Amino acid sequence: MDVIFAKIILKEDGRMITRRDLINDGFDCEIFVNETRFYNNMILKKDNHIIYIFKNKYNNLNSMFKECKLLTSINLSNFNTENVIDTSFMFNDCHSLNSIDLTNFRTNNVTNMSWMFGFCNSLNSINLSKFITDKVNDMNGMFSSCSKITSIDLTNFNTSNVTDMSYMLNSCSSLTSINLSNFNTNNVTHMNNMFSNCSSLKAIDLSNFNCDKIKTGDEMKEMFSGCYKLKIENIKHKDFKIRSQLTLDLKL
């Protein structure tokens, strides 16, 4: 089912609003059951808007809004995510999503953020300054094909436990700047296609990148492929494996 608008409604005491409560308020209610998203959650229709009623606590948000292709904005300011461990594919393929408020989104226990925002190709900007990523081990495809975002600030990201960064920023074709100066890649085993097709990226600082855990060329394959504006003099790096991959991808 396509979504026009979404927000969270909880009772003041934290309990779920009941079906009877909503019928009394004039909502047309129905239950939408799906094994992977919105499981046993209620969908309400009123004034051409669709409102989702969520449980008070979750531990798995995998694919929750996946392929909600008409969703344009979402406010998750009241969402209790303190127990969540998986946000993979959460907003994947939300092609019309251009605004999202994650300022109160707690990620303290999240271990998997793979493809979380993948193919959100209408998203102009995203504020992740409150994200805590200390336990995250998978960022594969996290921002892949966010083709309208011009800048992402990830300075607060703790990536010391991340093992997979493949396709992380792949096809962010409008991205001109990104701050990765605090990235810790000591445990990363996969960086293939990490920046591939970032065709507007002109400079990048990879001074802190450590590729010791990367064993084969396939694990860095096409890391910078399609970065047509990226010049070697604007790339800071110390790891010889990065230099080798730059030589291959940029045909230096």
Listing of model-derived features with the role each one plays in the protein:
Residues 51-63, 78-89, 104-115, 130-141, ...:
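Short, solvent-exposed linear patches
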Residues 24, 75, 86, 101, ...:
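Residues marking helix boundaries in flexible regions
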Residues 1-82, 206-215, 221, 225-252:
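N-terminal capping/linker segments that flank leucine-rich repeat
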Residues 64-65, 90-94, 116-120, 142-146, ...:
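Periodic small-residue-enriched repeat registers in elongated scaffold domains
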Residues 57, 69-72, 83, 95-99, ...:
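Canonical position 11/12 of the leucine-rich repeat
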